[in-house]
Structure formats: C-alpha cells, structure tokens
C-alpha cells in the first residue's frame, strides 16, 4: 500500500483515514488474525488510535504513548510553559505568554472568524509581546513570522478535537504511557 498524500498538507482527519486504511488492509490479509489487531500511537497518534478504535469495535486494544488525554489547548499551553521554563523565562513572563497563547487559541477556535481574520487579530496579541520572546529587536520579525506560520487549518482542527469524547467511545483495553521527564506531553 502506497500513500498518495502530502504529509505537510495533511490533517488529523487524513491521518485517521490512513490508519483506517491500514486496519482494513490488515483485516484483508489472510495471515493476520483480525481480532488481535492493536493500535499504537505516539503523541497525536494516540488520539488517532483512539479515534479509529472508537469507530471500529473489532480493534483489540490501544497503546497510547504520550498521547492526549484532554483538550489540545491545555496540552499546548502545558508544552509552551515547559519550554518557557527551560528557556529561563520568569514566572511573570510565563504568565504573560500563557495568557497570549490562550487568547490566540480562543481566536483559532472561533468558527465565525476566517483564518485571515484570526491572523490579523493574533498579530495584535503577539506584537506587544515580542520583547518577552527576545530583547533583540532584530529577531522580532522572525519570531512573528514563526508564530504566524503555525496558525494553520491543521492547528485549528487540533484545537477543535473532542479528545475526552473520543476516548470515551473506545471500548477495548487501553494502555496509556507518559514519561515522567517528558517536556512535550507533561505528565500532569
């Protein structure tokens, strides 16, 4: 089976469809015991495994490695805070950046706004904070561009996922593992 997709243009929905296609191919393979298919996913792959297992009752189990267990905005806020701690940001700076991230995520989740409208409003949130990211003014345009480039349809879809609802639809056994020292998916 060969993929015809473009990875960088793919969304969570595309990855769910890919995983469903793999499960279908495994079930069609005579040498595979279809009732013993387990899905293993890392990070957002844990969500993808749960989504597939919640829709396909024949899945025998799910292993989620550092996969999401609650809303993606909370996970992303935790990730950013962990990175800001590693970057040596003060409590005040971290609080300011977290507040800005929450506002940007709120804008991204507002379905009434086009992505262009979100970006126009996000610039107004980001620009006053550029000195918190870096005191070096020569880096501000690069930082703004990096942040704005992440405001994509894929991020919008991630922020709209019903993670808890997806997991509650899973009826097979689940093993969820998160590393104690993980800075991307904070164990708490």
Identify the residue ranges that each predicted region occupies:
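Conserved alpha/beta-hydrolase
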Residues: 1-2
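Alpha/beta-hydrolase active-site loop
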Residues: 8-29
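Alpha/beta-hydrolase fold nucleophile elbow
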Residues: 32-42
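Short beta-strand immediately N-terminal to the catalytic nucleophile in serine-hydrolase-like folds
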Residues: 39-41, 65, 177
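Short glycine-enriched nucleophile-adjacent loop
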Residues: 46-57
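Accessory cap/linker subdomain of secreted extracellular hydrolases
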Residues: 65-168
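Short beta-strand/loop motif that positions the catalytic acidic residue
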Residues: 170, 176-178
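Conserved alpha/beta-hydrolase "acid-adjacent" motif
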Residues: 183-188
């Amino acid at each position: 089976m060969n993929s015809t997709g473009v990875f960088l243009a793919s969304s969570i929905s595309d990855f769910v469809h890919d995983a469903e296609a793999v499960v279908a191919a495994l079930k069609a393979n005579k040498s595979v015991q279809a009732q013993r298919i387990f899905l293993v996913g890392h990070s957002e792959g844990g969500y993808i495994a749960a989504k597939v297992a919640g829709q396909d009752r024949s899945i025998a189990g799910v292993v989620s490695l550092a996969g999401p267990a609650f809303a993606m905005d909370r996970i992303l806020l935790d990730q950013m805070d962990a990175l800001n701690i590693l970057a040596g940001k003060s409590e005040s700076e971290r609080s300011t950046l977290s507040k800005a991230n929450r506002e940007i995520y709120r804008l991204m989740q507002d379905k009434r706004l086009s992505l262009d409208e979100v970006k126009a409003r996000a610039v107004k949130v980001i620009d006053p904070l550029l000195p918190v990211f870096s005191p070096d003014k020569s880096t501000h345009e690069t930082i703004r561009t990096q942040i704005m480039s992440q405001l994509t349809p894929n991020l919008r879809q991630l922020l709209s996922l019903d993670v808890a609802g997806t997991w509650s639809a899973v009826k097979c056994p689940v093993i969820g593992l998160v590393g104690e020292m993980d800075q991307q998916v904070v164990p708490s």
